[in-house]
């Protein structure tokens, strides 16, 4: 099955609005946090081509603790993007603390979530090709990108967040490793902006 868009870490769908609007193919949105899921479902309820998967994607099928900013703390922290901070590492969330973002441990919720590997996701939805894969998972991008069998699935473009690749607000050898991996599968690598990378498959 072909998907025009697969988004891992879809949040409420707000930042995907433009991508969703220009799609004519099937869309798969993945999001593990309940209050984000509720908004995501509401925001996309009239689009029949969208399927929403309630889980996290990592390198294996498992159930594990997931940390995110409490819904009740988002307005207190006065940053709209706080609802998008979710991670398998509590430290990653606390490391966002700054003068203007006074997050504390009491602002963090923990929940056991179901995780699928990318391979299991592909098998579940019988995915053979993806026009655009977007990954925004607060530092878990490395495990996902490393686990993909690029020879068995056609992915035209991958957009992924780079700013937390090796640690919170740190880019290092893991990012270099993934860039080299994508280059080995004949992808062109470019900075989309200061936080994200675009990898485009070259079929020539």
Regions found by a protein language model. Give the residues of each.
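Phosphate/nucleotide-binding beta-alpha loop and adjacent structural elements of enzyme active sites
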Residues: 1-204
